[in-house]
Amino acid sequence: MKIGILGGTFDPIHFGHIRPAQEVKQQLKLDEVWLMPNHIPPHKQGTHVSSQARLAMAELIADEFPCFKVCDIEAKRDTPSYSAMTLTQLTKIYPQHEFYFIMGMDSFLSFTRWHEWQQLFGLCHLVVCKRPGWLLDDKDPMQKILTPRLHDVARPLPAKSGKIFMVDITQQDISSTQVRQQLMQGIMPSAVLPTSIQEYIRHNRLYRGDSSTKTD
């Protein structure tokens, strides 16, 4: 099976995560996309709710959207969530699968600062979500990594790993920080959160400020 991997803090998960993943699945003809909540993200100070809550919200999305599954391998880990470590584990557990690691352009531009980033090319393909019409500057040092590995979606794949797909994605102007700020102000940003996530946040009194959450 062709499996997309979308990792993140999902603090909380919102349509800015869900819609691009759906577009990637459609364009690359993936069988599934696995949502993988991080436990301890190496590049962030922490999260605003527990790993259990973020995992539960991801499960709600998987229940609502059949194309998604939840991978809890990082959420259950007590050490930082390094992608190379995770993909090494996944390829051992599921050697029959072909993995596509989904990331945004910001993550790709800082990719060489990731822990053991070179290993990922032996474990999976990279899928970089970009705005339509966006091009990487010819002088950008990432061109040396991108150019020999860039692969067109329409062409057959020669191997189970090592290629980079640049996928045009509908721009989603949704920020987890802004979502949390609204929630802490007592505003439910209903346009960017699935109903199941809104209900979970309300029921569990997450991201609360001084006032009770109200509908936007």
UniProtKB/Swiss-Prot annotation:
- Write down the superkingdom of origin: Bacteria
Q: In which pathway does it act?
A: Cofactor biosynthesis; NAD(+) biosynthesis; deamido-NAD(+) from nicotinate D-ribonucleotide: step 1/1
Gene Ontology BP terms: NAD biosynthetic process
Q: Report any Pfam family annotated for this entry.
A: CTP_transf_like
Q: Which InterPro entries match?
A: Cyt_trans-like (IPR004821), NadD/NMNAT (IPR005248), Rossmann-like_a/b/a_fold (IPR014729)
**EC number(s) on file:** 2.7.7.18
Signal sequence segment = none
What EC class is this? transferase
Q: Which GO terms describe its molecular function?
A: ATP binding; nicotinate-nucleotide adenylyltransferase activity
Q: Which Gene3D superfamilies match?
A: HUPs
What reaction does this enzyme carry out catalytically?
A: nicotinate beta-D-ribonucleotide + ATP + H(+) = deamido-NAD(+) + diphosphate
Belongs to which family? Belongs to the NadD family.
Q: What does this protein do?
A: Catalyzes the reversible adenylation of nicotinate mononucleotide (NaMN) to nicotinic acid adenine dinucleotide (NaAD).
What is the protein name stated in its UniProt record?
Probable nicotinate-nucleotide adenylyltransferase
| Lineage of producing organism | Bacteria, Pseudomonadati, Pseudomonadota, Gammaproteobacteria, Alteromonadales
